[in-house]
Amino acid sequence: MENLVFVSAQPDVQYFHWQVKVYVHNFIEKGINPNNIHVIFAIVNKEKKPTEESLKLKEMGINVHHYVDDRFQKHYIPNIKPFLISKWLKEFPKYGKCFFLHDADIIFRQLPNFENLLNDDI
């Protein structure tokens, strides 16, 4: 599990900041290395730079990435996630082999056996 990267992608808005704080605290509490946690934010609402609150998340020891939301069509909100993942993978292709993509509203009661999932042929 040491090579598994945990990734969430969402707009850089207050609603998601607190969700990220909660799940990061939970992940670290369950033994996930903060260095393996990547939070990807879209800079939205015609802003040009990340919010202070999203930048402060770096103090938790996690990786925080920001990309301007320059999608041509923004009316279908869920497509922000694949948009952000593609931007992130273009910048960091080494993470493309294996990552656990999750929403920001996640917590683990206990960790799944990721080794079994990683060794599955499916």
Which functions belong to the PLM regions below?
Residues 79-122:
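GT-A fold catalytic core of metal-dependent nucleotide-sugar glycosyltransferases
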